[in-house]
Design a protein with these regions (language model features):
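Ligand-binding pockets and gating/stacking loops
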Residues: 1-467
């Protein structure tokens, strides 16, 4: 009889003692227990803000006078024959200028569009990276590449890697939480917050939208804590006995741990999602008083409350279905709506984190899966829009370990691609890990005979934006 079998057979005679507690002595450690970082990193938590669809960098973050000069004209040949830009569209068309005014802000003199008036007031806390490149011009592979480091499904997401490397600081809440757009699911679905080839314990936990992010948080009528504990122990006994007879039990181990976590969350999660204790001033800071900003504002406020309670990685997804940032046409109508939905909530998040002393330990990252082209996509003649551009993405970071007001990289005069060295998306991943105290080359996992890592062949840590 093995030790595990002895534990199983002893279960009923031990008066219903939690099997999870019994196995803890044997397993030696919880996969989500806090772990020491490889390096000294200021960031203990990360909030990753992902704008799905491909955000137009030249309409929000990059002031390019040449777009005004060439408005309505064909782009110079040297620019419009770059890589996939020459083939993805039928043909590069007339240049369309930004339809919104730009102004410089803060001590850093950062140019920002007037579509982001609230974020413009936070630029001295942010660091911008220009000319970021992904390896595919289509949404699906580009989303995967940005959020998992690989163009194809099956790889571990950024949040999974971070929790694998650092564990979680709160055993009563998930270490990696995801909040999606209320209008639908993101491209790739659960894969973009999944564990991939990592153990299933590191996958993200999805919170629902609206005022009830977690369903069935309250036990059903007549269910006492003692009775629920007994039921859970019996269920765990069956699951663990099943697992003992098999080798690859990552999914089942994660399910057992999830049941235990759900039991503990009944006492801790209600306080997390209950916003009644927040002041009206705080709620307005996030835009909860405006139906346009209330949805994403609620998620940003919850994200602050999560990192406040030790959740390691929080991912917020904005844009879904026909309401993504994918402005092939009618950009004058669509981009202001998307921008307004997130501008005040994200600025509120940065200001709130800073006022509470949380920003210095919380890394905030903003990204999309691609940028846009300077020329008209010409889908609808009188409603111009911009095409996909895998070369011109802008990413910004703020908080833990980031140099306030810094800028790295630049794009050409038409905001098509990097004017100097490109910034592959793996450089963003490498920098994120470094700010969290993780070495990209030591954060590995053996799978199918190869040591996998988030940055694949390796990325450059962008030291120019690190304080």
């Amino acid at each position: 009889m093995t030790r595990r079998e002895l534990l199983f057979d002893s279960y009923l005679g031990l008066g219903g003692l939690s099997l999870a507690g019994l196995l803890q002595a044997e397993e030696s450690s919880d996969p989500l227990a806090p772990k020491k970082p490889h390096l000294a990193g200021k960031a203990k938590n990360c909030i990753f803000l992902f704008m799905e669809g491909g955000v137009s960098q030249m309409d929000l973050f990059e002031y390019k006078p040449m777009l005004v000069k060439y408005a309505g004209k064909q782009m110079p040949t040297a620019i419009r024959t770059v890589g996939e830009l020459a083939t993805f569209s039928a043909a590069p068309n007339r240049v369309i200028p930004p339809f919104w005014k730009f102004a410089q802000h803060g001590q850093s003199g950062r140019w920002m569009s007037d579509l982001l008036p609230n974020l413009a007031g936070c630029t001295d806390d942010m660091a911008f990276i220009h000319g970021v490149k992904v390896d595919n011009n289509n949404h699906g592979p580009a989303v995967y590449h940005t959020l998992t480091g690989n163009q194809f499904p099956g790889s571990a997401s950024i949040g999974a890697w971070v929790t694998y490397g650092l564990g979680s600081e709160n055993r009563d809440l998930p270490g990696f939480i995801v909040m999606g757009d209320r209008r639908g699911s993101t491209i790739g679905g659960t894969s973009v917050w999944g564990n991939g080839y990592l153990p299933a314990a590191y996958q993200g936990t999805l919170f629902r939208n609206g005022e009830t992010p977690i369903v069935d948080l309250t036990p059903r009528p007549g269910m006492t804590a003692v009775k629920q504990r007994e039921e859970l122990d019996l269920l765990n006994w069956f699951n663990t006995k099943h697992a003992a007879q098999r080798t690859n039990t990552s999914e089942l181990d994660a399910r057992i741990a999830a049941y235990e976590l759900a039991f503990r969350m009944q006492s801790k999660a209600p306080d997390l999602v209950d916003l009644t204790g927040e002041t009206e001033v705080t709620k307005k800071l996030y835009g909860l008083d405006d139906p346009v900003t209330e949805g994403f504002g609620r998620q940003c406020l919850l994200a602050r409350r999560m990192v406040e309670r030790g959740v390691r990685f929080v991912k917020l997804l904005h844009g879904a279905g026909g309401d993504r940032w994918d402005d092939h046409g009618a950009i004058k109508d669509r981009l202001p709506v998307h921008s307004q939905e997130v501008d005040k909530p994200i600025a509120g998040l940065l200001k709130d984190l800073k006022s509470r002393g949380l920003l210095e330990n919380t890394l905030v990252v903003w990204a999309s899966e691609m940028g846009r082209t300077p020329f008209d996509n010409n889908l609808v003649t009188d409603k111009p829009g911009r095409d996909h551009n895998q070369y011109g993405l802008v990413v910004w970071m703020a908080g833990g370990g980031v140099k306030p007001g810094a800028t790295f990289g630049e794009t050409d005069d038409f905001s098509v691609r990097a004017a100097g060295d490109e910034v592959p998306i793996r450089d963003i991943h490498a920098t994120l890990l470094r700010l969290m105290g993780l070495d990209q080359n030591r954060l590995t996992y053996l799978h199918a005979g190869r040591y996998k890592k988030l940055t694949d062949i390796g990325g450059r840590v962008i030291k120019e934006i690190i304080a």
